[in-house]
Amino acid sequence: DVDGATSSSLLKLFLHSVGCEAPVHIPEREEGYGPSKTAVDEFAALGTNLLITTDCGTTAFEVLEYAKNKGMDVIVLDHHEAETRLPDICAVVNPKRLDESDEYPCLKYLAAVGVVFLTVVAVNRELRKRGFYQNRPAPDLMKWLDLVALGTVCDVVPLLGLNRAFVRQGLKVMSLRQNCGLKALADKASLSEAPTSYHLGFVLGPRINAGGRVGEASTGSRLLCATDDFQAAMLADRLDGFNALRKEIEAYVLLQAIEILEGTPQPYPIAFVYGHDWHQGVIGIVAGKLKERYGLPAFVMSVENDEVKGSARSVPGLNIGALVMAAKEKGLLTKGGGHNMAAGFSLEEKNLEAFRRFAGEYAERALGKEKIVPTLEIDGVIGLSAATPEFADKLSLLEPFGAGNPEPRLMLGGVRIIRSDIVGSGHVRCVLGSFAGGSLKAMAFRAADSEVGKALLNRRGEPFNLAGTLRKDTWMGRTQVQFVIEDAMRG
């Protein structure tokens, strides 16, 4: 994923800057998550004596022991949930180690790329102390904060404390367009304005992720490490193509998952669904969309040759990573790991129903047995006349937005739909008006088939209260304010 691509790229770029060339291995989906014996064998054939894992490895006991027996020193740089025991290797750098001090609680929120950046800072300080830079320039670590920001936002870790500082400064670095890979990807996505956390999470991130989902897993990391514009443009073009394919596959799997969930009883406060030969590259995205649709923790799995691979996304109140680790320790899963809001796992098909019961009962204990009613928290109420570029500028001072610091959700009261139509991939475009005069453009993304979209399309002229966010939209060099609709109710 993006956290893995950015953390491995950052480490590779730093090592290159101090004269050490380090090949990067990003596992293809068929190889499975985390380090594998195949990868260890490939590195051993190159004469490798130091193996570093990023964004994985904390619970990879067998493979890391295998690497040790091949004569390698091993270091893990990770942020996923740990077990009571740790691999017997040189170092496990992970703020979620169970023996880790609580002196700096904000470190427990770090993405893997944040862990790698702090490791690089510490190594750089030690090199300076030992006189390594007496006859060579020290690298400018700040220039890599764009990678730190990208991985942090895309891994949906809370944007609090150090993470907030990383993203705020990283966005400034990204606006300089120094990384030719990110520059090429932004150009491919027609992103010419100053980037925000929205662009990281919903424009650049999905394209980098697409390689690992439906194409070649290493493409994203290769792009971020690209050293010339031609190579970067070629890789950006490939990722854009992978992303288009990913959208098609995702729509198909999502439709099937919804049909299954709404056609069968769901006895627990979870959305638990599986299908045969669903593309494993999109099940994580589908889990996220099911979580949003039903307001429940979502488990989505693909069954292939009696083996099941799954992905889960959670809601506040349920640590999904801890659930997966508990199921693994109980013997229900063959592999698994994650953090508060997301997890991945594997199991045998014969254990599917046992895992459903375990996950459902675990969720019941955490969330209660009462039916979860999805709620939409509103931060403020405005009228149409207040939806101005100046007000949007003031809201942007609260950036970066993301997990732990969500974009302010506003209720736009007393408006009517003047015009509405469907554009793009099922988006509903509107022009809003008020009885006091004035107009405002609005968009409800991927809403054409939803109840909200149907209301916007079929009830023109009627009064509505709309919930959503106010953003500035730049197109062809022209900036306007736009309301992004999440929900609607009759006024």
Where in the sequence are the language-model features?
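Hydrophobic helix-and-loop "lid/oligomerization" segment in the mid-to-C-terminal part
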Residues: 1-50, 70-71, 88, 125-357, ...
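Histidine-centered active-site/metal-ligand motif
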Residues: 79-80, 95, 279, 339, ...
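Structural signal for conserved beta-strand scaffold positions within catalytic alpha/beta enzyme cores
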Residues: 24, 76, 92-94, 149, ...
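Mid-to-C-terminal polyanion-binding domains and interfaces
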Residues: 231-237, 241-273, 326-491
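Short alpha-helical basic/polar micro-motif
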Residues: 114, 284, 288, 466
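A short acidic, often aromatic-flanked loop/helix-cap motif at beta-alpha or helix-coil junctions
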Residues: 31-32, 98-103, 385-387
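Active-site cavity-forming subdomains of large catalytic enzyme subunits
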Residues: 41-133
